[in-house]
A protein has these predicted regions:
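Alpha-helical transmembrane segments of multi-pass membrane proteins, especially transporters
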Residues: 73-78, 103, 107, 111, ...
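Membrane-spanning alpha-helical segments of multipass transporters and channels
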Residues: 124, 129-215
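Transport-system extracytoplasmic interface segments
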Residues: 1-84
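A generic alpha-helix surface/boundary motif
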Residues: 31-32, 119, 152
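Repeat-unit-sized solenoid/scaffold elements
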Residues: 78-95, 145-161
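Membrane-water interface at loop-to-transmembrane-helix junctions
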Residues: 63-71, 98-113, 135, 161
């Protein structure tokens, strides 16, 4: 989006330069005046543009797409952990409501531990091994852990209702949602903004990471 805005501004300034140059030369021509070397040099670019980037993405940020780079492995890890824990829990015998309740609590606690490992592990891999620019390790790791736990709870709830068939739904969300998340919402059509992008559960992760990384 920033690249497109910069290109548009460059075209606008270039058109203004051409218009001003033509008007000034036409005025000199009507008056029969002549131009000095300095005046001619200034007429080449009568309007000088000074570009200053705000909230620059910095180095080693995947050209500003580091939130998207972190989303995909986090989503897949959350989906895999929810599926594995669900399969393990579903095979355990339950004879009473109390045992079923304790089993659900155990599922949530196990998921919380798994998502902590996912959040801190992914941040460590991205920072130490991949080399992404992560200015605040702890905030990023905690945010990813909370996000992963939220994904885990959502996926587990769906799996408890429809079974392992629900995994296909979240795979489709990854397949169709990731391309939309890489675009600025202003670049989407009103339909996608209101009925697709606003309903993507992972958009909150992308927006949160952008706040942590770039603002």
């Amino acid at each position: 989006a920033s690249t497109m805005a910069g290109q548009m501004l460059n075209v606008i300034v270039d058109n203004m330069n051409n218009t001003v140059r033509a008007q000034v030369l036409e005025g000199y021509k009507e008056k029969g005046g002549t131009l000095t070397t300095d005046q001619a040099a200034k007429l080449v670019t009568p309007i000088v543009k000074n570009v200053k980037n705000m909230n620059e993405v910095g180095k080693n940020s995947a050209n500003g797409n580091s939130p998207i780079s972190l989303f995909q492995p986090l989503w897949i890890a959350s989906l895999a952990s929810a599926a594995i824990i669900f399969i393990a829990i579903s095979k355990m015998p339950v004879s009473s409501r109390k045992e079923n309740f304790l089993l659900k609590v155990n599922q949530i606690v196990t998921g919380a531990i798994a998502t902590l490992v996912i959040g801190f592990g992914l941040t460590w891999i991205a920072d130490g091994m991949v080399g992404l620019n992560i200015s605040n390790f702890t905030d990023t790791a905690l945010f990813l852990s909370i996000t992963s736990f939220s994904f885990f709870l959502m996926i587990s709830a769906v799996l408890s209702l429809v079974g392992l068939k629900g995994i296909g739904l979240f795979a489709l969300l990854l397949f169709f949602g990731a391309p939309l998340l890489s675009l600025a919402s202003e670049m989407l059509s009103p339909f996608y903004q209101d009925w697709v992008y606003s309903w993507l559960p992972m958009k909150f992760m992308i927006e949160g990471l952008r706040e942590i990384f770039f603002f």
